[in-house]
């Protein structure tokens, strides 16, 4: 019986296979009257509304990248979308083409490893998405139908914006097919539903039947060049964005978790094309913000690595490796890039500047740099300052697009960003064309020796705190904030002032947190002690309260409603298990020369609780802060009961605090202080 079932199964498989073979037409049957062929790397056939793509026989086994972008529509210009990515073209049988997406989480990077063959046999890759072959060309290229993937599918490219509603596929059409040196691009006009009220007063919207408007999208199929994988392994000391994988060739007994960096192939210059619709007043600052990175590339041995050009009418944005655009819909500066999942090579990138990009940036600059830059005091919207901020933002985004992690570029108030030594070292590590390396492991060892020689001592330490100066500068601005906002005497109901006032108080809170983060860090003991003194000077006992008199007198905003949540975060950091554990560890490892937990509590009591001096006057705000500190302390003990050693240290110190408060609750001359300390004691119980 089982033998009979087996025979039936084989017959069914054969029947299915034969039917698949029969579905493949001859080229003469396929190439109907009126069909048009567009020659190129990937020939394209068009008949009425159907679009077919030919995969030449020699490209089977090659890799392609399928990506897309929104060209225009919904007030968007050249915005990247999620693409299919890098796939390998496979042909498992005569009737099928597959786009395989191998997984690279497990690898053997050593091409000469004796385990290569066994690894490849055991590490079977998925077949990927399959596409029926419609016909074969006279050159034996496989022809597949791709209409639905362009018109209404989400497989090759997709986008998700709340203001773009459902697709109306029956109205969508392919409007342009453009072969280029590396592949072919398809421009599609899709129609989406729209919330009519949103566009009632928008000159950019044309309301079409059934409430839909067009969205122009381009999908690019790019044949990736055949070349040796240019992998550069990461080192934790140099901040790059990375891909993590498990390597079986570094240790004969187990896998080793490793990572490689994301970077461009700089064998030819990377040209950033700027959209022709980009405002000319900003072109130069964007150009300078990009080209400033050439300083780092020159030190890495690469000249004219980055270039900037205006895109002319012949340039199709979606086909370019790097493109910069300006549109109206989404304020702010955003960047995105695609990369090869095996090699980490960055393949394309986009920089999008949305109208209103300066929103918030000028206010941030006023609060942080206004005390030293009179231009922003004279005019909150100074064009010169706006351009400098844009250039700085672009420089930071380009660093991200080059594969770097974090912002390594440096600037000070009133200046544009310069590429510092940290950034130059990072570019050298990622892009210097090393010679004489046998493989990626040898290359990394060579770079590690270079790092050991060139990375200065103390790189891992936090820089000296300048938050004290920042708090002082913020105080200067806050004192005159109403005069700056209402320059010329024109005043509203307070909304303009209230918005920036809230931001100022939150910034004050962030500065206090920055000071607090020094405690428990790798900074020297003197720096950590100084941080506690600064908290005393700028929070516990400030000479001048961080306040705007106009806001307070006109009851526009309650300062403490904004500040106190920030203080909760600060105390939860200072009293966290991580911070206290780090302080205890410092005391053990430094022969009592480090900043210990005893030192921390001594400084905390001296500042916040006046060293328990009964003659010291205590303000209502100081009592509020004491209560916030105690509540954070109790929360941490409750949330971390499992951390026995450090939690016990916190509990013991809390009992010590209780005994001191108990004494003050009976002898302090201020009745309200006695009442408060009685309340605190009740909470501790």
Regions found by a protein language model. Name each.
Residues 3-10:
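Sec-dependent signal peptide recognition
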Residues 279-286, 290, 383-391, 501:
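Solvent-exposed, acidic/flexible segments
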Residues 11-19:
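Hydrophobic h-region of N-terminal signal peptides that target proteins for export
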Residues 24-25, 310-333, 388-435:
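The catalytic-center signature of Zn2+-dependent metalloproteases
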Residues 22-278, 296, 311-361, 365-386, ...:
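Auxiliary tRNA-acceptor-end handling modules of aminoacyl-tRNA synthetases
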Residues 411-685:
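Conserved catalytic/binding loops enriched for acidic/polar residues
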Residues 60-61, 279-305:
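Zn2+-dependent metallopeptidase catalytic core
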Residues 284-291, 295, 392, 396, ...:
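Solvent-exposed, polar/charged alpha-helical surfaces in well-ordered, non-transmembrane soluble domains
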